[in-house]
Every structure is written in structure tokens, then in C-alpha cells.
């Protein structure tokens, strides 16, 4: 070992040795902290990937359940538009099926004819189908008005939500879509 010649050198040698130990301790601490940070980053990335995969699986389950519910609702609507009634009498029982290929409301089936016709032709077509053109007073305050608006009414005028004096139409020349209303038994 070296022996210092004066007190100043002795202090510097001693302090350098202590300083070196402190540097090694700080470097060791930095390495440990850096390693801990890296490990925590890897763990958090793995947990994010796991959570993302879990959420994707749950989303797929929810979407398939939603599609199933929509399909069930469509089947229910289709079943509601086709009525199946049993009529019983004192002697026999009848099984009577009727279907409505249109809008069903309070025992009536509203069937849209999208071809544009004169009022007289529309009325004749409905009569041939054992049905009538809709009456404005029957549909005005119901949800049906959104569908039957601007179609022929039974009085020869178009069915509209509003009434005004200038709405008189020329039934001899004007053509419109029309609904035929058939009473379901």
C-alpha cells in the first residue's frame, strides 16, 4: 500500500476509495431499479394483451347474442303478422289460418300496392281482392299514418297528416300508390 506524504494526499486517497464504493453502490442500485422497471413493463404489457383478448371474446359473445335477439325479434314480428286462430263452436272445432303480407293493425291487414294507379283503378283492384281503400279517420291518429301518408283514401283524396282546403286532387288524372285494407277473421 502506498503511504501518503502529506495529509492532503492521505485524505484524497482515502476519499477516492470511499467515493469508488459509493459509485459501485449507485450503479448496482441503478441496475436493480432498471431491471425492476423492465420487469414491470413486461408484466403490464402482458396484462394489457390478456385484457384485450378477454374483451374481444366478450364483445364477440355480446354481438352474437345481439344478432340472436334481432333474429328472434324478426321471427316474432313475422309470427305476429301471421295470425293463427282457433274458432270453436258447439259442435265442431275449426283451425283457421290467415296471413297478412302487409301491416297488421286491430284486425285489419293493410297491403301496399306500390304501382301508381288512378283512384278508380285502385278502388277496383281493392274491390277485386275483397278489400277496401283505407279510411283517413281510421289511420290518422295511429302509427299507420307514417306508412299510408300520400296514398289513396276511401274518399278519393290522398291521405295526409294535415288537412287544408287546397288539397283537392283531380282523381281522373292523378296517380298514387295505395293500400288495400282487408278485415282478418
From Swiss-Prot:
Gene it is expressed from: OPG161
Keywords: Disulfide bond, Glycoprotein, Host membrane, Membrane, Signal-anchor, Transmembrane, Transmembrane helix, Viral envelope protein, Virion
Gene3D superfamilies (UniProt xref): Mannose-Binding Protein A, subunit A
Organism: Vaccinia virus (strain Western Reserve)
Glycosylation sites (chain numbering): 125, 135
Main function: Forms a complex with OPG162 and OPG190 to coordinate the incorporation of OPG164 into wrapped enveloped virion (EV) membranes and, subsequently, the production of actin tails. Therefore plays an essential role in efficient cell-to-cell spread of viral particles.
Parts of the chain on the Intravirion side: 1-33
Subcellular location(s) of the protein: Virion membrane; Host membrane
Listed name of the protein: Protein OPG161
Pfam family, one: Chordopox_A33R
Region (C-type lectin-like domain), start-end ranges: 98-185
Ranges facing Virion surface side: 57-185
Bilayer topology term: Single-pass type II membrane protein
Subunit and interaction comment: Homodimer, disulfide-linked. Interacts with protein OPG190. Interacts (via C-terminus) with protein OPG164. Interacts with OPG162.
Family of the protein in this entry: Belongs to the orthopoxvirus OPG161 family.
Membrane-traversing stretches: 34-56
Amino acid at each position: 500500500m502506498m503511504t501518503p506524504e502529506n495529509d492532503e494526499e492521505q485524505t484524497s486517497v482515502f476519499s477516492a476509495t470511499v467515493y469508488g464504493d459509493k459509485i459501485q453502490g449507485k450503479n448496482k442500485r441503478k441496475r436493480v431499479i432498471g431491471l425492476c422497471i423492465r420487469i414491470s413493463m413486461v408484466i403490464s404489457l402482458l396484462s394489457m394483451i390478456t385484457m384485450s383478448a378477454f374483451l374481444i371474446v366478450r364483445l364477440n359473445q355480446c354481438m352474437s347474442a345481439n344478432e340472436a335477439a334481432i333474429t328472434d325479434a324478426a321471427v316474432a314480428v313475422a309470427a305476429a303478422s301471421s295470425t293463427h286462430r282457433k274458432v270453436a263452436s258447439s259442435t265442431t272445432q275449426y283451425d283457421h289460418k290467415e296471413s297478412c303480407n302487409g301491416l297488421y293493425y286491430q284486425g285489419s291487414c293493410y297491403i301496399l300496392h306500390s304501382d301508381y294507379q288512378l283512384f278508380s283503378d285502385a278502388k277496383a283492384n281493392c274491390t277485386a281482392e275483397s278489400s277496401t281503400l283505407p279510411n283517413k279517420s281510421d289511420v290518422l291518429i295511429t302509427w299507420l299514418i307514417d306508412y299510408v301518408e300520400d296514398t289513396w283514401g276511401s274518399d278519393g283524396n290522398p291521405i295526409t297528416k294535415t288537412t287544408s282546403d287546397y288539397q283537392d286532387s283531380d282523381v281522373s288524372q292523378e296517380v298514387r300508390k295505395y293500400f288495400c285494407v282487408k278485415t282478418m277473421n
